[in-house]
From Swiss-Prot:
Summary of subunit composition and partner proteins: Part of the 30S ribosomal subunit.
A single GO BP: translation
Organism per entry: Mycoplasmopsis synoviae (strain 53) (Mycoplasma synoviae)
Keywords, in A-Z order: Ribonucleoprotein, Ribosomal protein
Cellular component terms per the entry's GO annotation: ribonucleoprotein complex; ribosome
Record-level Gene Ontology MF annotations: structural constituent of ribosome; tRNA binding
Record family assignment: Belongs to the universal ribosomal protein uS10 family.
Function: Involved in the binding of tRNA to the ribosomes.
Keyword Ribonucleoprotein attributed: yes
Membrane-spanning residues: none
PANTHER family attached to this UniProt entry: 30S RIBOSOMAL PROTEIN S10 FAMILY MEMBER
Name of the molecule in the record: Small ribosomal subunit protein uS10
Coiled-coil annotated residue ranges, if any: none
Length: 101
């Protein structure tokens, strides 16, 4: 029994949810079994930099980026569905990772 895990990720959670819904609707339209979208833990990356170059060590600025993720698992996906998924139009700022199991 082949399973394909599709990880949807991006910086804006609303856009990531929208992309995950597109994947699910495509799976429903092609009558494939699926699980998800499952919310995965948000990755938070924080960077601290000095405001000035050589002086004022106490004056710093912090930036963070959050990467939101959703997981959709397809059970026995058809080749037609996989082709459609690879050509799917997604909003800007959303990425997909495919993993076969």
């Amino acid at each position: 029994m082949a399973k394909t895990q599709i990880k949807v990720f991006g910086f804006d959670h609303k856009v990531v949810d929208e992309a995950a819904k597109k994947l699910v609707s495509l799976a429903v339209a092609t009558k494939n079994k699926f699980v998800g979208p499952i919310p995965m833990p948000t990755k938070r990356e924080e960077v601290t930099i000095l405001r000035s170059v050589h002086v004022n060590k106490k004056s710093r600025e912090q930036f963070e980026s959050r990467t939101h993720q959703r997981l959709v698992v397809l059970e026995n996906p058809s080749s037609e569905l996989l082709d459609k998924l690879k050509r799917l139009e997604l909003p800007a700022g959303v990425g997909l990772k495919f993993k076969e199991k």
